[in-house]
Amino acid sequence: MSDRRHFRLCYVIHYFRTFEFTNGVYGLLGPNGSGKTTLMRCITGLYNVKGEHIFYNGKPVEKDKSFSRHVGYLPQKFGMYQHLTLNEMLLLIANMKGLDDKSAREGVEKALGLVNLTDCAEKKVKALSGGMVRRAGIAQTLLGDPDILIFDEPTAGLDPEERLRFQSIISEIKKDKIILISTHIVEDVHAVCETVAVMRDGKIIKSGTREEMAACAEGKTYIIDMDDLPKFKEPYYKQKQFDSDGKYYLRLVSSAPQDFAPVKPNVEDGYICALKGI
């Protein structure tokens, strides 16, 4: 039987209804300034939360000195010492996490393999590209095999192939873990997250499975020829524009009655509806 871990949050930023995370992969969506990074920093202990508002397995984390060892965190801005090699930098982080030398070496080797950086192990950090540094950040998050993994914009700056690799890593390691991913890339959420939470103004305003999130836009999602836009009743929100066979189309969400047939919604449509209160 798997070990069911959980932590519970309430009143973390401006207002939080009680929200419990159990084993699984959670996608956190929201515009800039909505509180996603603040929430993550509260969970990791980087921000002091007044009162007993964050619990891990029923115990307030501020009273649990071992809590930090359960958490792996990739901040939005991740940097490393430029004069060290990548291998030296990750070994340093592993030692700071309390790993013994043997476990550190084995953990670094495995993590570098997962993010496709084995060939860069002896390169100086200053010689790495921005995408490589981001992948190194993902690698250091995995060191020590923590129970809780928190990724803030993990695929920012990664090419499509490496984004797919990240999704594969999450799918591979997610068993018996709590994984929280904050991102602007809804495709990442759709690919790996079982539960989606939408934040606005420091609040989680909507949460549910991917299917439940998409259902928020049921009967409200349309694809129309761009030339038909004047016929589309306001209010509406443009989701995306694309071309097919030389014609341009718009994907729109609207709660207003329309003379167009709705299409099957996806997670991004549901996110827009939740964010805009449609």
Question: Locations of the language-model features?
Answer:
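Walker A (P-loop) phosphate-binding loop of ABC-type ATPase nucleotide-binding domains
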Residues: 31-35
